[in-house]
Amino acid sequence: MLHEVLYKHLDGILVSRLYTEDQFVDLFSRTIPESNTVIASQLYKSYEENDQRIIEKIDKLIDNKLSLIRVELEREQIEDSISLEEVNKLLHSIDDMLQQHLNQLNIELDNKNTKLLKYAMELSDIEAIDTSMYDNVAKLITDMETNQPSS
């Protein structure tokens, strides 16, 4: 595509692209009436050879530049690939750290739940004692009010 764009541009500049040999010789003869058509023809052929060399050099320059661009793009893709690999490793590392932290939090939560359950059971025992004591005190008060000996 780049070559095509360049060729369109060269079509408006290079003599061999602007004119056929006959057109050039005719134009040359009309512009310089005392000129020889053989000289005009040789001059056109010289232009044609020069134009061809220019086109070849430009093609080569474009191809070289495109090749350099491809190499650079491939290098960047490799760097991006390496970068993606590094990012992937970092993500795995972060995932591992988060998993370890989550495991630690689960262990701490289990420990707290165990302590809370133990505390609840102790409270339950105390509550049973309190209820029993309350019942005994209530009976004692009732007995005292009725003047009955407590048991």
Curated annotation (Swiss-Prot):
Entry keyword DNA repair: no
GO biological process assignments: cell division; meiotic cell cycle
Keywords: Cell cycle, Cell division, Centromere, Chromosome, Coiled coil, Kinetochore, Meiosis, Mitosis, Nucleus
Keyword Coiled coil applies: yes
Subunit field text: Component of the inner kinetochore constitutive centromere-associated network (CCAN) (also known as central kinetochore CTF19 complex in yeast). NKP2 interacts directly with OKP1 and AME1.
Protein family: Belongs to the NKP2 family.
Role according to the record: Component of the kinetochore, a multiprotein complex that assembles on centromeric DNA and attaches chromosomes to spindle microtubules, mediating chromosome segregation and sister chromatid segregation during meiosis and mitosis. Component of the inner kinetochore constitutive centromere-associated network (CCAN), which serves as a structural platform for outer kinetochore assembly.
Protein name as catalogued: Inner kinetochore subunit NKP2
The species this protein was found in: Kluyveromyces lactis (strain ATCC 8585 / CBS 2359 / DSM 70799 / NBRC 1267 / NRRL Y-1140 / WM37)
Lineage per the UniProt record: Eukaryota, Fungi, Dikarya, Ascomycota, Saccharomycotina
